[in-house]
Every structure is written in C-alpha cells, then in structure tokens.
C-alpha cells in the first residue's frame, strides 16, 4: 500500500492537491493541517511526521523529497529518521526491492554509492530520481474515490521541542534596475562593436 503524508499550515489539505497526488498512484493520503505549522521549524515538522507514521503503523519505508521548495534546508528527512530511530539515506537516485532488503543507489561527488538496507528506513530521493507521472482522466476519476484521512494535530500528542525556531520575518532581495539598450543588427560588424563598447561601459569587460 502506498500512502501519501503531508503536514502544514492552512491550505495543505486542498482537495485538488490530494486528488492530484492520489491520481499519481497513491492508495490513500493522510493530512495534518494546522495554522501553527505554517512557520514550523524543521524539527517540529519532522516530529509531526513521525507521529503520523506511528499513527499509520506497520510502515516499511518512508520516501521523501530531498528538500522543500521554500526553505530547502534538507533537514527534515534525517531529523525524521532520528525521531523514528531508523537509518536515513540522502541523494537517492534508485531503489530496487530484493529478497528481504532494498538495494539503494545514491549520488556522491565522484560517482554512485550502492547500499543494501534491511528493515525500515527513510530515503530522501534526489530531484532527478524519477520523472513525474502525469495522471490521465481515468486516474483522476479514480482518485476521487480514494480515502483522505484528516488528522488533528492535538490528537497526535507530539512531544514538545526543547528548542523551537520561529520565523521572525521575510524579505525579498532588492533588484537593481536593468538598463535596456537596443542594437541594430543590420550590420553585424557594427553591431558587434556597439555590443563590446556597451559591455565595457557597463564594466562587464
């Protein structure tokens, strides 16, 4: 059975998101939506995910992305594994099942590392580990009939964290105004000379 799990702030339980995930092959999804999780730290999110996994029970393998698109800290998979007491493997590019174990390939700076894992584990897949599956109309219609379980954060009784990270603000880097300059390319040699001159004036050459 393939179970999708997501936790987060308001909007994480959007029906369209659940349907899209179920249409890609999941059997069911389990969701924890709570406003307090909108700015939760990595350790807090990992603790909630661990409690959800314990709630599901009898989980053989947890597969995550390597990082989130917003913070990209790459911390949740390893912290989650620590919460569960399971081994963690990052930058996974391939997973193959074999008798009583998993054969895992992971990218390393000078090549590929091959690992054999027995027992439950947390594997963080690299961004190019698999091509996203595009669900068809039949998949989306079937997804509407699959179960979606909504869990209350309070019911999970997540142990309090000794240290808590709080987001105190966000800022968008200021962009320098760009100087646009059009160059007539009717005469290639003249255009090239104008381009070189413009780049020198801008300090790019």
Regions found by a protein language model. Give the residues of each.
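N-terminal glycine-rich FAD/FM-binding segment characteristic of electron-transfer flavoproteins
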Residues: 1-205
């Amino acid at each position: 059975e393939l179970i999708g799990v997501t936790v987060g702030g308001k909007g994480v339980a959007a029906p369209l998101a659940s349907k899209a995930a179920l249409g890609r092959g999941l059997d069911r999804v389990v969701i924890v939506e709570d406003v307090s999780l909108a700015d939760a730290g990595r350790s807090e999110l990992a603790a909630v995910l661990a409690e959800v996994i314990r709630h599901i029970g009898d989980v053989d393998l947890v597969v995550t992305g390597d990082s989130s698109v917003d913070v990209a800290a790459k911390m949740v998979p390893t912290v989650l594994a620590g919460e569960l007491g399971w081994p963690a493997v990052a930058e996974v590019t391939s997973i193959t099942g074999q008798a009583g174990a998993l054969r895992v390939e992971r990218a390393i700076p000078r090549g590929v590392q091959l690992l054999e894992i027995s027992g439950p584990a947390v594997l963080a897949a690299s961004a190019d580990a698999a091509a996203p599956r595009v669900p068809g109309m039949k998949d989306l219609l079937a997804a509407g009939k699959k179960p979606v379980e909504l869990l209350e954060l309070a019911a999970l009784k997540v142990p309090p964290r000794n240290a808590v990270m709080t987001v105190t603000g966000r800022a968008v880097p200021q962009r320098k105004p760009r100087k646009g300059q059009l160059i007539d390319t009717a005469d290639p040699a003249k255009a090239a000379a104008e381009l070189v001159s413009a780049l020198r004036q801008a300090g790019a050459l």
